[in-house]
């Protein structure tokens, strides 16, 4: 595990791709929390969700940094360096109401 993120400078301002996990919305699945790819804007579900689509997106694309998106939490995670980033001054606004599942 790295001490610092070598990819922090690559964080992009992105437009979220969906109002929920893209893949879960297509299949009717549920999620716990959402993660936003700060390279392309893909919205995927967290690793506590059954399908772990945000991690799958990283594995398929190599896009290194996600943002804790729903709820907005002000942090990022670099999959490559395995470190948290402070995104509290650069949080992505939500595009609209996001469905929630219990």
Language-model features and meaning:
Residues 3-11, 15-20, 27, 43-102:
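Cys/His-rich, Zn2+-coordinating zinc-finger modules
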